[in-house]
Design a protein with these regions (language model features):
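S-adenosyl-L-methionine-dependent methyltransferase catalytic module, highlighting the catalytic core
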Residues: 59-66, 70-72, 76-169
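Conserved SAM-binding loop
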Residues: 2-86, 161-169
């Protein structure tokens, strides 16, 4: 089973099961990202593109350990996050304005349909788009390797984003 976490409005077609906290079309599982409803070692591949930065920095280690729990040994993790260091350096050098830096580093309000309105508790849905953790290549590498993954390949894509491919250790 291949699982995409935080699939949002455009679930990736290469994955079998799409997970999101919001009840969106084509989402099969509604769940928090740090308590997945999957059996231990039941997932063959896990993708989380622009998801982990939305988790509190106090919870990212436990979240990655939960993802490692559900993944079988040798399964691949495909993780994408903004490169906060790159964006901050662009801002300091005056290459981007404060509004753009805020968008990339802090996330937040969005006009996307998934972020309109309020949830069942009255909380604005755009809050789920706020960023609570920043990453750069070094911090991402340290965290992922600390949480049970090996064979890491971290690289920049789309200029301001990091992608990490890693294998669940045995």
């Amino acid at each position: 089973m291949k699982v995409e976490i935080g699939a949002g409005e455009k679930p990736h077609p290469d994955y079998d099961v799409h997970v999101d906290i919001l009840p969106l079309p084509d989402i099969e599982v509604i769940s928090w990202i740090d308590r997945l409803p999957f059996a231990t070692a039941s997932v063959d591949a896990l993708r989380a593109n622009h998801v982990l930065e939305h988790q509190s920095y106090e919870l990212v280690e436990g979240t990655l350990r939960e993802w490692a729990r559900v993944m079988r040994p040798g399964a691949w993790l495909d993780l994408g996050v903004p490169d906060a260091r790159f964006v901050a350096e662009q801002w300091v050098r005056g290459e981007i304005d404060t509004a753009e830096a805020n968008y990339w580093i802090l996330g937040g309000h969005s006009d996307r349909a998934a972020h309109r309105g309020v949830d069942s508790r009255g909380i604005p849905r755009w809050i789920w788009n706020a960023h609570h953790t920043m990453f750069d290549a070094g911090s991402l590498h340290a965290l992922v390797s600390h949480c049970g993954f090996t064979d890491l390949d971290i690289f920049t894509y789309d200029i301001r984003n990091l992608r990490c491919y890693a294998r669940r250790s045995s």
